[in-house]
Amino acid sequence: MRREYYDDPDAPEPNSLVVATSAVVLDDAGRVLMQRRADSGNWALPGGAMEIGESLAESVVREVREESGYEITVTGLVGTYTDPRHIIAYSNGEVRRQFNVCYTARITGGDMAISAESTEIRFVDRREMDGLPMHDTQRLRLAHFFEQRPEPYLG
C-alpha cells in the first residue's frame, strides 16, 4: 500500500530520496493517458522511479512502456516538482521524498496493456478528471499542462 502526504504535520520523516518521471500523453481526441494505481486506488499519470544508468528521458519512456504498453517520444517538459512537503509512505517501511520531472510525449507505437501496478488504464477527458480520485500533486501537473505555459514549471 501507498499513502501520500502533502504539507501534513503528521507525515512520517522520509528515509529515501527518489528521482521520478511522468508524462502527459494525449490521444487524437486530446484525452490524457492515465492509470488507476493498484497501491492507492488513485488515478495518476504514467511514470515512476528513475533507474541507475538511464537518463530522465529514458526513464519516462521505459515507465510509460511498462505501465501502459505504449512506446512514446518525449516532446516537451511540463515541469519539475521538488516540493519537500510531498512525502510518500509505503507499507514496506520506505518513506520517500520524491521529486518528479513531468514531460509531454506522443505515442509512437505499442498497444494499451495494464501492468501489475495498475487496476485500470485509459484515456481520460479533461472534464472527467475532477470526479476521479487523484492526489493533489497529480492535479497540479495536469493544471500546468492545460495552462499551456510558455515556460516549464520549476518548483
Feature locations, PLM:
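Short connector loops at helix/strand junctions that flank enzyme active sites
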Residues: 18, 38-40, 45, 72, ...
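Nudix hydrolase/Nudix homology domain
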Residues: 41-42, 112-155
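Conserved Nudix-box catalytic region and its N-terminal flanking loop in Nudix hydrolases
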Residues: 27-67
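Acidic, metal-coordinating catalytic segment for phosphate/diphosphate chemistry
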Residues: 1-22
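A short coil-to-beta-strand element that immediately follows conserved catalytic motifs
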Residues: 71-80
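Short, well-ordered beta-strand micro-motif
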Residues: 25, 102-106, 123-125
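Active-site-adjacent beta-strand/loop module that shapes the phosphate/pyrophosphate-binding cleft
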Residues: 82-111
